[in-house]
């Protein structure tokens, strides 16, 4: 047997090394940048998952929360300052019903990542401060006139929300509160009429 030349031996070694390197590369492929990006995108949890909500829903919840705070604080004022039993009872009902609705709305908003107002804005605070300066029949009449106007507006907004909004939870909230708002309006109209009758008899 002839001894292979040094050149032939070097060639064989080179082929073997190349083949071995190719095998290792096949077993451990280097991830390309697109692959790495796709993996991270697939594995990263979406912050919006389960919390995404439209601007219309966000606007409705924010305004409903502010309106609810107005009703509760106005009701507390009426329960304390009203002269007529009908007005005092109406104020107490506002505290009870809108207080519960406010808590329900907070839970819905929290689950969707929406921050609701926790206190009155300057405009509504000013309205209640002016109302608080009244007393007796003047307070009763002014408060009930505001309540009739507010509940008519609330009903229109909640009807629109129940019809047009896309989010099922917010839509259901609006729809479920309509019967109570309509009852409040009937009560407000009756109490407002009573305050006018009393004023007419003075």
Regions from the PLM with identified roles:
Residues 2-12, 22-202:
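His/Met- and acidic-residue-enriched segments that coordinate or traffic transition-metal cofactors
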């Amino acid at each position: 047997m002839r001894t292979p030349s040094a050149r032939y031996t070097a060639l064989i070694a080179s082929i073997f090394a190349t083949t071995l390197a190719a095998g290792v590369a096949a077993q451990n492929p280097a991830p390309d940048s697109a692959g790495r990006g796709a993996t991270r995108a697939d594995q990263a949890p979406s912050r919006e998952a389960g919390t995404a909500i439209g601007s219309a829903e966000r606007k409705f919840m924010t305004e409903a929360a502010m309106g609810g705070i107005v009703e509760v604080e106005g009701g507390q004022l009426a329960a304390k300052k009203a002269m007529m039993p009908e007005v005092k009872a109406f104020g107490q009902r506002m505290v009870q019903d809108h207080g519960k609705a406010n808590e329900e709305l907070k839970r819905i908003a929290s689950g969707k990542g929406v921050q609701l107002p926790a206190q009155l804005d300057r405009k509504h605070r000013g309205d209640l401060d002016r109302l608080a300066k009244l007393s007796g029949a003047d307070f009763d009449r002014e408060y009930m006139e505001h309540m009739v106007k507010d509940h008519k507006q609330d009903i229109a907004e909640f009807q629109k929300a129940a019809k047009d909004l896309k989010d099922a939870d917010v839509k259901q909230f609006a729809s479920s509160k309509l019967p109570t708002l309509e009852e409040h309006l009937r009560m407000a109209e009756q109490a407002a009429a009573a305050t006018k009758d009393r004023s007419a008899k003075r």
